UniProtKB/Swiss-Prot annotation:
It comes from Methylocella silvestris (strain DSM 15510 / CIP 108128 / LMG 27833 / NCIMB 13906 / BL2). Its cofactor is Mg(2+). CDD domains: KH-I_PNPase, RNase_PH_PNPase_1, RNase_PH_PNPase_2, S1_PNPase. This is Polyribonucleotide nucleotidyltransferase. GO terms for molecular function: 3'-5'-RNA exonuclease activity; magnesium ion binding; polyribonucleotide nucleotidyltransferase activity; RNA binding. The lineage of its organism: Bacteria, Pseudomonadati, Pseudomonadota, Alphaproteobacteria, Hyphomicrobiales. One of its GO terms (biological process) is mRNA catabolic process.
Length: 714
């Protein structure tokens, strides 16, 4: 019934299996991939005919994690998987980025990749396996695809690079780098690092590239056995339409790209585009070319004009040379009620970044296949349409916004203080108010400034820069701080963020073959110079964290209580902790290890809550004086509640100096008194005294008498 084909190999000490022919046989391509005991199913389907009226490749990648893969039932009311999680969105982008450039130019057929995680061993992250399975499914599908693609993860543990570290090993790693590419070229890099050098980062990229070569070989072997007949792809002759567009537009387009202001340049380019449309689509005659072909030819001519100017003249769209960073203005403290704020402007790109500090209650609960965990650092990136002078959809963030936010999150996170050093939940919001390239890196710069403005003790400020590359044969040019046009007209887009000490985040997307290790080294070195320049400009606004937290930020103090006392502090049904919160006004968060965080904007509120918690969790000390309340008066003395829920007896002989006839002559129920803890009797009952305490001042009279006696002897 099944015609199953399988390839197996040992990859970084674990078995990788690629199988096709048993599951999802009606898809154009389907591969079941297993690494360790993690299994994913990748399927790909592409329409047989192009989608009319579009000038882009309609590729959709959907990565989905099923809770059953880890033996879990989803949370929530409906108990089933819902909208994509942040990780699912990020992995979908991770798969999309290296495969998209490998489809033929002009391919307009609707194409959908669906990757489903079926089993997760909690040791091998499914993301790399998902990328490998997708590549294999495309390679055997018969769909036009210039692959296969391989992928690998590289860590840096105990001073050595490690291929495909496990989930646990990654927790100890100073690097989390994912690299993807073909047999002879790197196409994509995504990473987070703890201030590593450019040299080490490049070495990690090349280690990953070498590491996935056996996987590419295995995919090729699978395709030799199981690949479908390749589809025929009609290759359009573009020479005639390109010549027609060039004759009409080249001269004026060159002039348009001498205009340095973005909006004015766009107007000039639109005017040239309108001229082409008028010439090639006359109202009184049948057009020679389709609108899609003319639009494609015009875009290609735009790219050529920009590239010629850069390679031949060394001049960029806005008039800069290759290495110059646009003018920078950094401002902090611009929002009066925010805990920390910054406005970072670089040329025509601007980010308004706001830092907010919260308590443990504000931590985000993240539900994943590995289990539920809490995240104390959040970074949200928003890209409203007005930032590029357009109208558009507003609402929940799209994939691009989630991806850009995660890139900035990775860049800043290694510089944050630990939870023990700074027990706050931190949220960053970056509002992109203007954009002309590199808005995610503006978010990195603005985030550092806003955090320091809020008083967060960063190890060092972080800055980021977006770089580009133009490659024609043997000639190439590396561009610092690219514009939006240079991004989509160039051959490589990579973003580097870090401190003066090293790189904290690197993202790279390469669109063409031929970019060598040497070219990437030149680009990384040039990016370092740009990053250090930006850090210098940022230091003009703020060089380090403010000494005090923002005026409106909550204050948090921590204390440790014995774990066996947690239940007493919380009380039955939360009764005790609710009473503490209601009466002191402080927020209280108790961890399983006995760490208690008490937060309030009022210092007295924090002190009162801490004293209350200590009175419950700690044992009273002999010789200490406490304030208490008389709860019962009896013939032989009075019972006083003096330490949380603890009561003790003040014997009638200890109520006052001299003889006391009746206890009620000295104290009454409900009266506030000061008592000294004398100790405990044979049965563990508490013995208290009032006679040795000044009821007005709380002074220890016994200690005072002893001191006076000692002084007289001396």
């Amino acid at each position: 019934m099944f015609e199953i084909h399988r390839e197996e190999l040992d990859w970084a000490g674990r078995k990788l299996t690629l199988e096709t022919g048993r599951i999802a046989r009606q898809a154009d391509g389907a591969v079941l991939a297993t690494y360790g005991e993690t299994t994913v199913l990748a399927t790909v389907v592409s329409a047989r005919t192009p989608k009319p009226g579009i000038d882009f490749f309609p590729l959709t990648v959907n990565y989905q994690e099923k809770a059953f893969a880890a033996g879990r039932i989803p949370g929530g009311y409906f108990k089933r998987e819902g909208r994509p999680s942040e990780k699912e969105t990020l992995v979908s982008r991770l798969i999309d980025r290296p495969i998209r450039p490998l489809f033929p130019e002009g391919y307009r057929n609707d194409t959908q990749v669906v990757v489903t995680v079926l089993s997760h061993d909690l040791e091998n992250d499914p993301d790399i396996l998902a990328l490998v399975a997708t590549s294999a499914a495309l390679t055997i599908s018969g769909i036009p695809f210039m692959g296969p693609v391989g992928g690998a993860r590289v860590g840096y543990i105990n001073g050595a690079l490690k291929l495909n570290p496990t989930v646990d090993e990654l927790k100890e790693s100073a690097l989390d780098l994912v690299v993807a590419g073909t047999g002879d070229a790197v196409l994509m890099v995504e990473s987070e690092a703890k201030e590593l050098s450019e040299t080490l980062m490049l070495e990690a990229v090349m280690t990953g590239h070498r590491g996935f070569q056996p996987v590419i070989d295995a995919i090729i072997r699978l395709a030799e056995k199981a690949a479908k007949e390749p589809r025929e792809l009609a290759v359009a002759d573009k020479a005639e339409v390109e010549a027609a567009v060039r004759d009409i537009a080249e001269g004026e387009l060159r002039e348009a790209y001498k205009i340095t202001a973005k909006q004015e340049r766009y107007k000039a380019v639109d005017a040239v585009k309108a001229k082409v449309a008028l010439a090639l689509f006359p109202e009184d005659a049948e057009p020679r070319f389709s609108k899609e072909k003319v639009a494609e030819a015009f875009h290609d001519l735009q790219a050529k004009v920009v590239r010629w100017n850069i390679l031949d003249l060394g001049v960029r769209i806005d008039g800069r040379d290759l290495k110059t960073v646009r003018p920078i203005l950094a401002e902090v403290g611009i929002l009066p009620r925010a805990h920390g704020s910054a406005l970072f402007t670089r040329g025509e790109t601007q980010a308004l970044v706001v830092a907010t500090l919260g308590t443990g209650e504000d931590e985000q609960f993240v539900d994943s296949l590995e289990g539920t965990y809490k995240e104390r650092f959040l970074l949200h990136y928003n890209f409203p349409p007005y930032s590029v002078g357009e109208t558009g959809r507003m609402g929940s963030p799209g994939r691009r916004e989630i991806g850009h936010g995660k890139l900035a999150w990775r860049a800043v996170r290694p510089m944050l203080p630990t939870a023990a050093e700074f027990p706050y939940t931190i949220r960053i919001v970056s509002e992109i108010t203007e954009s002309n390239g590199s808005s995610s890196m503006a978010t990195v710069c603005g985030s550092s400034l806003a955090l320091m403005d809020a008083g967060v003790p960063l190890k060092r400020p972080t800055a980021g820069i977006a770089m580009g590359l133009i490659l024609e044969g043997e000639r190439f040019a590396v561009l610092s701080d690219i514009l939006g046009d240079e991004d989509h007209l160039g051959d490589m887009d990579f973003k580097v963020a870090g401190t003066e000490e090293g790189v904290t985040s690197l993202q790279m997307d390469i669109k063409v073959a031929g970019i060598t290790e040497e070219i990437m080294k030149v680009a990384l070195d040039q990016a370092k110079g740009g990053r250090l320049h930006i850090l210098g400009e940022m230091s003009k606004a703020l060089t380090g964290a403010r000494a005090e937290l923002g005026e409106f930020a909550p204050r948090i103090e921590t204390l440790k209580i014995p774990t066996d006392k947690i239940r007493e502090v919380i009380g039955t049904g939360g009764k005790v902790i609710r009473e503490i919160v209601e009466k002191t006004g402080a927020k209280i968060n108790i961890e399983d290890d006995g760490t208690v965080k008490v937060a309030s904007s009022d210092g007295n509120s924090i002190k009162a809550a801490i004293a209350w918690i200590k009175s419950i969790a700690n044992d009273p000390e002999v010789g200490q004086i406490y304030e208490g309340t008389v709860v019962k008066v009896v013939d032989f003395g009075a019972f006083v509640n003096f330490f949380g829920s603890k009561d003790g007896l003040v014997h009638i002989s200890q109520l006052a100096k001299g003889r006391v006839a009746k206890s009620s002559d000295v104290v009454k129920e409900g009266e506030k008194v000061k008592v000294k803890l004398l100790g405990f009797d044979d049965r563990g009952k508490v013995r208290l005294s009032m006679r040795y305490v000044d009821q007005e001042t709380g002074e220890d009279l016994e200690a005072k008498e002893k001191a006076e006696q000692q002084a007289s002897v001396d």
